[in-house]
Amino acid sequence: MKAKQSKTPRALATGTKLTCADNTGARIVQIVSVFGYHGVRRRQPKMGLGDIATVTVKKGTPDMRKKLVRAVVIRQKKEMRRPNGLRVSFDDNAVVVVDEKNEPKGTEIKGPVAREVAERYPKLGSMATIIV
């Protein structure tokens, strides 16, 4: 896993509901905790593009519902600024379910994937149809 190329805003807090953009069976997920977050003074854990979180499946197939899974954020509504000055934002907040080795559990990704995520996770980049 490589480092992020640009500083992405952490716009997604715990409790946020996101769409799942792969074919694992999960449709709507909710953030439970963020990996690598060490807060102070009762601050809410937040995350952005390329961050990994533990999420619970709220809507989906019966075998996926009510399960805790790991997920990577591939799209977020909050715009981010790239080093060349370009500002990028997406229509929705979306994640992809991954395993302990940060490899995707599904076989396809619906919709675009941010370039920063594709560079950081090569398997996600190879599965994506559109990289923005």
From Swiss-Prot:
Q: Which GO terms describe its molecular function?
A: large ribosomal subunit rRNA binding; structural constituent of ribosome
InterPro entries reported in the protein's UniProt record: Ribosomal_uL14 (IPR000218), Ribosomal_uL14_arc (IPR019971), Ribosomal_uL14_CS (IPR019972), Ribosomal_uL14_sf (IPR036853)
Keywords for this protein: Ribonucleoprotein, Ribosomal protein, RNA-binding, rRNA-binding
Q: Which Gene3D superfamilies match?
A: Ribosomal protein L14
Q: Which GO terms describe its cellular component?
A: cytosolic large ribosomal subunit
Alphabetized Pfam families for the sequence: Ribosomal_L14
A GO BP entry: translation
Q: How does it assemble?
A: Part of the 50S ribosomal subunit. Forms a cluster with proteins L3 and L24e, part of which may contact the 16S rRNA in 2 intersubunit bridges.
Question: Main role?
Answer: Binds to 23S rRNA. Forms part of two intersubunit bridges in the 70S ribosome.
Q: Which family does it belong to?
A: Belongs to the universal ribosomal protein uL14 family.
User: What is the protein named?
Assistant: Large ribosomal subunit protein uL14
What is the protein's species of origin? Methanoregula boonei (strain DSM 21154 / JCM 14090 / 6A8)
Q: Which lineage do the record's taxonomy fields give for this organism?
A: Archaea, Methanobacteriati, Methanobacteriota, Stenosarchaea group, Methanomicrobia
